[in-house]
Regions:
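Short beta-strand segments
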Residues: 31-34, 103, 133, 158-164, ...
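Short acidic, glycine/serine/threonine-rich loops at helix termini
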Residues: 41-42, 111-113, 169-174, 344-348
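Claisen-condensing/thiolase-fold acyl-transfer catalytic domains that form or cleave C-C bonds
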Residues: 76, 80-83, 87, 106-107, ...
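Anion-binding (especially nucleotide phosphate/pyrophosphate-binding) glycine-rich loop
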Residues: 89, 93-125
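Short glycine-rich phosphate-binding loop at a beta-alpha junction
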Residues: 96-103, 270-278
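Flexible, glycine-rich active-site loops centered on histidine and acidic residues
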Residues: 151-185
């Protein structure tokens, strides 16, 4: 078996040392993070004047107190700000990148993709740049792809950006959704390392399309292309969510994702220093802490200040933790995402 083929086995999750033999193992080390958050803050008190709700009701059910809204800002602008911040933190120039990945379910345009816009704005040169749309699991999925590129030798340095302007697709007359979501972007830079003790130790991503209707946002109307009246209902683009069904899915999917990632990394819950989950609902985050017998303070939470920012939530957390000195050398971090699709996943990161 060729060395190239062996590398591909490892890139796609094969961990059997008998198969890998003496092949050099390359890991994906996190070398920088960044974020870009809109200035405008939408508080629960402000929502009381827009929809039938109040601060106490929102906090008790979700944990959200305020969220950021991108007024007169494009998704690509948030993405660019986060990317520039991450590159500065990593102390590298965009010319050193081999690949740009953007996860978003709220792009400004279906084409061109947001990553291509970033490639130009950053001055990154002739490199690969593409978007993925995997809803709230987007950052975890993009990290998995970045790790595959690095492990296979196709890339040395990869920029992953998650950017969302969910306020565009939220119905502010629907108190079941408008209380949850916010806008924002964050980014991570991964670089190849030969140190097996650093970087991404394992990844896991999966989907359960049987729950597709639980979280849904129409892209293009299904209609007769030759119909005389092609008027589209303005509310057709709004996000629709069956909250109770999503919570039931999460209770099953998140432990499966984390357990699988831990198993693939060859570690147990006792080795975890931090869990960095998608910021969906405070009750869900409490369930994660209980499931893995972790103190609540070891499950990072910032959704009280930013709400649910879909794919951007995990990297926003990572950036905030890194800037506040909470991420330290030798720690083991588990990041997990879950949401529309339905999709779910996790990865283990060693610092």
């Amino acid at each position: 078996m060729s060395i190239k083929l062996l590398s591909l086995f490892h890139a796609f999750g094969e961990s059997d040392s008998k198969i890998l033999g003496s092949v050099e193992i390359i890991n994906s080390q996190l070398i920088g993070t960044g974020a870009c958050l809109p200035d405008f803050v939408l508080t629960n008190e402000m929502l009381e004047h827009m929809v039938d709700t109040n601060d106490e009701w929102i906090v008790q059910r979700t944990g959200v107190r305020e969220r950021r809204i991108a007024k007169n800002m494009h998704t690509w602008e948030l993405a660019l700000g986060a990317a520039q911040d991450a590159l500065a933190d990593a102390k590298i120039d965009a010319s050193e990148l081999d690949l740009i990945l953007v996860s978003t379910c709220t792009p400004d345009t279906n084409t061109p993709n947001t990553a291509a816009i970033l490639q130009d704005k950053l001055g990154a040169g002739a490199i690969g740049a593409f978007d993925i749309n995997n809803a709230c699991t987007g950052f975890v999925s993009a990290t998995d792809i970045a790790d595959c590129y690095i492990k296979s030798g196709k890339a040395k340095t990869v920029l992953v950006v998650s950017a969302e302007t969910l306020s565009r697709i939220v119905d502010y007359t629907d108190r079941g959704t408008c209380i949850l979501f916010g806008d924002g972007a964050a980014a991570a830079v991964y670089r190849a390392t030969e140190d097996e003790s650093l970087g991404i130790q394992s990844t896991f991503v999966a989907a359960d399309g049987s729950g597709a209707e639980y979280l849904r946002m129409e892209a293009l109307p299904v209609e007769d292309p030759f119909a005389e009246d092609r008027t589209v209902d303005p509310k057709a683009r709004f996000l629709k969510m069956q909250g109770a069904a999503v919570v039931r899915f999460t209770a099953r999917a998140v432990p499966q994702a984390i357990d699988t990632a831990l198993q693939r990394a060859g570690i147990t819950a006792d080795d975890i220093d931090w869990v960095v989950p998608h910021q969906a609902n405070l009750r869900i985050l409490d369930v994660i802490a209980r499931r893995y017998h972790l103190p609540k303070e070891k499950v990072y939470v910032n959704m009280d200040r930013f709400g649910n920012t879909s794919s951007a939530s995990v990297p926003i957390c990572l950036n905030e933790m890194r800037r506040n000195g909470l991420l330290r050398e030798g720690q083991t971090i588990v990041c997990t995402g879950f949401g529309g699709g339905l999709t779910y996943g996790a990865f283990v990161l060693k610092l």
